Amino acid sequence: MKDTILVIGSSGQIGTELVNELRSVYGNSNVIASDIRQKKSDILVESGPFEPLDVMDKELLYKIVKKYQVTQVYLLAALLSAKAEPNIELAWKLNMSSLSYVLDLAKEKYIKKIFWPSSIAVFGTTTPSIMTPQHTIMEPNTVYGISKLAGERWCEYYHQKFKVDVRSVRYPGLIGWRSQPGGGT
């Protein structure tokens, strides 16, 4: 059985490039782009399946996963630092509920694999900035950083307790050539 991949948050800086690359590897029909917003001339819509999705709508998320028989989820939806600070409750709800829903999908065996990016925002200002070790002081000072640190712990927990295959990378501030810097840079 070929993998079917759902990319949540596909209209963002990373998502747009990721969907294009995944479609070149897995085939256009095997990579479902999803986002809360959709541009009318969006290449993601023209090149393969697109599902409008507010990732905080757990029922709709489950419906999409079942409809396409999704095997992998790339969860990129998040409220980043600059936009999260004035919207603390929304940021926490979006950043944590979405991860919880996707982890539960894997725990319940609907999907096989999760990719969820973390961020250097987990460190905060007290972390050594030169040759930062993997295991070090983590004192995030933004709601985004706090949610990413909590998310890392949840991913570890689900992996250890339920054998969920979840992978993550701590991204630095990213700037792409196709999009303007947004809420995180």
For the regions a language model picked out, list residue spans one by one.
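NAD(P)H-binding glycine-rich loop region in Rossmannoid oxidoreductase-like domains
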Residues: 55-94
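Conserved Rossmann-fold NAD(P)-dependent oxidoreductase catalytic core, especially the SDR/UDP-sugar
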Residues: 100-143
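A hydrophobic alpha-helix adjacent to the NAD(P)-binding/active-site core of NAD(P)-dependent oxidoreductases
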Residues: 50, 91-92, 106, 114
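Flexible, glycine-rich beta-alpha linker
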Residues: 123-124, 142-143, 167-185
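N-terminal Rossmann NAD(P)H-binding glycine-rich loop of SDR-like oxidoreductase domains
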Residues: 4-25
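Conserved beta-loop-beta element that borders a ligand/cofactor-binding pocket
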Residues: 118-119, 152-177
